[in-house]
């Protein structure tokens, strides 16, 4: 039988955005710790001792590379919020519009590069691996910037902009074409005055498996869909092993990912939050470092004086 908290994660395995925590007020009080520290020297002591580090990343780290977050007052594509388009219902209703939205996102990401935060994580992972220590990255992002930075041990829990899934045969495939199909060339402009292209469904991305030709969809987790149970089990395993957790650029409001770090903290494991602002989970963590991840992470993850040179 799986551990109790993986069962609990499954209960919350539908993707929600902007919802208040389902944890009761009484439980919140029990989980709340003293005000988190911003003492980098103290964090570095924890970092030097850690053998199995888990990094949980969200949209904030990629925003520093110029990737739109689709959150807050400016979080619109044309007149739509991401929550309006990133659903199975929206795709069934208007696959052309949804593919325009994702084509725009693919094109934006293909023109961006990993920032100093991504690179610091990847370099730290490679360096500690040579020392027999582990760094695992669990990301909510679908932009593959961690992968582009060189991160190897990576769990992309919400999928990838650069993978497709056939709605007929179910095959998942990598796809880095630009544009992904000829009909989307020059489409997807985010301006509110732009009219939908109204691309016929037969001209949208199609499956290339022999004898199929089914309509493709982005291989991402949409609002209202379940996360892959196999990935959640991998996440559960890594969180159970970790002795230091970093929460990087995440708002801590999207479930089930918002539960991961507080659960680790409840076991007494040090958790450090790196973000531009505080979040609903900040008070549960031992450390909080405010500012751009590209500034705070390189200092936090730099080689410690106790590390062996390799």
From Swiss-Prot:
Subcellular location per the Swiss-Prot or TrEMBL entry: Mitochondrion; Cytoplasm, Cytosol; Nucleus
Residues the record marks as active site: 158 (proton acceptor)
Transit peptide: 1-36
Sites where the protein binds NAD(+): 58-77, 140-143, 249-251, 275-277, 293
Keyword NAD: yes
EC number: 2.3.1.-
UniProt-listed Gene3D superfamilies: SIR2/SIRT2 'Small Domain, TPP-binding domain
Catalyzed reaction equations: N(6)-malonyl-L-lysyl-[protein] + NAD(+) + H2O = 2''-O-malonyl-ADP-D-ribose + nicotinamide + L-lysyl-[protein]; N(6)-succinyl-L-lysyl-[protein] + NAD(+) + H2O = 2''-O-succinyl-ADP-D-ribose + nicotinamide + L-lysyl-[protein]; N(6)-glutaryl-L-lysyl-[protein] + NAD(+) + H2O = 2''-O-glutaryl-ADP-D-ribose + nicotinamide + L-lysyl-[protein]
Database matches in Pfam families: SIR2
Residues that hold Zn(2+) according to the record: 166, 169, 207, 212
Keyword Nucleus: yes
Annotated substrate binding sites: 102, 105
SUPFAM superfamilies, sorted: DHS-like NAD/FAD-binding domain (SSF52467)
Record domain Deacetylase sirtuin-type: where: 37-307
Necessary cofactors: Zn(2+)
Source organism superkingdom: Eukaryota
Gene Ontology MF, one: zinc ion binding
Record's cofactor remark: Binds 1 zinc ion per subunit.
Assigned protein family: Belongs to the sirtuin family. Class III subfamily.
Oligomeric and partner information: Monomer. Homodimer. Interacts with CPS1. Interacts with PCCA.
Function in brief: NAD-dependent lysine demalonylase, desuccinylase and deglutarylase that specifically removes malonyl, succinyl and glutaryl groups on target proteins. Activates CPS1 and contributes to the regulation of blood ammonia levels during prolonged fasting: acts by mediating desuccinylation and deglutarylation of CPS1, thereby increasing CPS1 activity in response to elevated NAD levels during fasting. Activates SOD1 by mediating its desuccinylation, leading to reduced reactive oxygen species. Activates SHMT2 by mediating its desuccinylation.
Name the UniProt record assigns to this protein: NAD-dependent protein deacylase sirtuin-5, mitochondrial
Protein's organism: Bos taurus
Gene (name only): SIRT5
């Amino acid at each position: 039988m799986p551990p109790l908290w993986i069962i609990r994660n499954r209960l919350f395995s539908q993707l929600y955005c902007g919802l208040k925590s389902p944890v009761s007020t009484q439980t919140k009080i029990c989980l709340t710790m003293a005000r988190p520290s911003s003492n980098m020297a103290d964090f570095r002591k924890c970092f030097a001792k850690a053998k199995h580090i888990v990094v949980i990343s969200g949209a904030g780290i990629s925003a520093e590379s110029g990737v739109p977050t689709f959150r807050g007052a400016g979080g619109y594509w044309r007149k739509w919020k991401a929550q309006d388009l990133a659903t199975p219902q929206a795709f069934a209703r208007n696959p052309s519009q949804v593919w325009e939205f994702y084509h725009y996102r693919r094109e934006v990401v293909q023109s961006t590069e990993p920032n100093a935060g991504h690179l610091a994580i990847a370099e730290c992972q490679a360096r500690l691996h040579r020392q027999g220590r582990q760094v695992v990255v669990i990301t909510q992002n679908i932009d593959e910037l961690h992968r582009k930075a060189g991160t190897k041990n990576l769990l992309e829990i919400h999928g990838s902009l650069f993978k497709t899934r056939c709605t007929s045969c179910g095959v998942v495939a990598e796809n880095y074409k630009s544009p992904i199909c000829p009909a989307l060339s020059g489409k997807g402009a985010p301006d509110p005055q732009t009219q939908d292209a109204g691309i016929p469904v037969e001209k949208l991305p199609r499956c290339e498996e022999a004898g199929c030709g089914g309509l493709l969809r982005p291989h991402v987790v949409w609002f209202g869909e379940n996360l892959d149970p196999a990935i959640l089990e991998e996440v559960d395993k890594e969180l159970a092993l970790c002795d230091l957790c970093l929460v990087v650029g995440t708002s801590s409001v999207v479930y089930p990912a918002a539960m991961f770090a507080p659960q680790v903290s409840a076991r007494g494991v040090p958790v450090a939050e790196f973000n531009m602002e505080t979040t609903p989970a900040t008070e549960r963590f031992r450390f909080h470092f405010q500012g751009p991840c590209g500034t705070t992470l390189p200092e936090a993850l730099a080689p410690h004086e106790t590390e062996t040179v390799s």
